[in-house]
Design a protein with these regions (language model features):
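Class I SAM-dependent transferase core
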Residues: 1-35
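A generic structural signal for alpha->beta connector loops
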Residues: 10, 62, 89-91, 159, ...
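General small-molecule cofactor/ligand-binding pocket signal
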Residues: 14, 93-95, 186-189
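Conserved Class I SAM-dependent methyltransferase catalytic core
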Residues: 18, 142-199
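Residue-level signal for inorganic ion chemistry
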Residues: 29, 119, 148, 206
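Conserved SAM/SAH cofactor-binding pocket of Class I
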Residues: 32-129
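Mobile active-site "lid"/loop adjacent to the S-adenosyl-L-methionine
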Residues: 120-147
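SAM/dcSAM-binding transferase cores
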Residues: 198-246
Length: 246
């Protein structure tokens, strides 16, 4: 993705200050997540804030999104992008700092969120670059699975949902952490970037109370056919409200 502003159909985000730009993982998470009945959503590891804005676009009037970001430059960009959101009757606010302290700075939000989303720094024990900001955005040294699950459980109200995206090789680890904290699995979507390739990512939705007996629903999402940008109808159905040219 380009380093300059990224223009969605209904909003734009500045991203020159964020180590990680608008990308497919966040696009999939933001378009897939259900916002029905959501009054308060929190995006953990928000980067430049675009996932939160994707949610806000579909949320009702009177609702709010918070974006929580640790890395300083990305957090400032998140604060700017969320404060400039164009959706009437809705509000958005960025917050700079570690999510492990968010509940201390915002105690009024403990147990109040209907939805938490996260496209977290999900690489564990992988080679790092010389760019510290990029390492913060990609590696889990400062936000482990346990940190994320515990923070989300603290901030969500009973019945609140946690939606995330992870590499496929961390599925069992995430299931162990989430169920151990007290979440119940509702939906899992296994993502293939192309039909002929193995699964690369998975989306998961967990609820802070038991899900329906027929859960956990297992699905597969294929992003592209046999060529780059040959988007499948399945993927286009998700991204058409957002991505120009679709």
């Amino acid at each position: 993705m380009a380093k300059g502003p990224f223009h969605f159909k209904s909003f734009s985000v500045e991203q020159d200050g964020a180590a990680m730009k608008v990308g497919m993982d966040g696009m999939v998470l933001g378009s897939w997540t259900d916002v029905n009945g959501v009054d308060l959503a929190i995006d953990i590891g928000a980067g430049n804030g675009y996932v939160g804005l994707m949610l806000l676009q579909r949320m009702a009037q009177g609702t709010k999104v918070y974006g929580v970001e640790l890395e300083h430059d990305a957090a400032q960009q998140c604060i700017e992008n969320l404060s400039n959101q164009p959706f009437a009757g809705r509000t958005a606010e960025g917050w700079s700092g570690p999510v492990q302290r968010f509940h201390l700075e915002k105690p009024e939000l403990v147990g109040m969120a209907d939805l938490i989303v996260s496209n977290p720094p999900f690489y564990k024990n992988k080679p790092k670059s010389q760019d510290n900001a990029r390492n913060l955005a990609r590696h889990d040294d400062t936000l482990t699975m346990g940190d994320l699950a515990q923070s989300a459980h603290r901030l969500l109200k009973p019945g609140g949902r946690l939606c995330t995206i992870w590499p496929s090789d961390r599925l069992e680890e995430w299931e162990s952490w989430s169920s151990g904290i007290g979440f119940d699995a509702c939906r899992t979507v296994h993502i293939k970037t192309m039909r002929h390739l193995p699964e690369k990512r998975f989306l998961s939705e967990w609820r802070k109370q038991p899900c329906a007996p027929e859960s956990n629903v297992q699905e597969t999402l294929i992003l592209e056919g046999s060529a780059t940008l040959d988007f499948t109808d399945q993927y286009l159905a998700f991204i058409q409200p957002y991505l120009r040219g679709t």
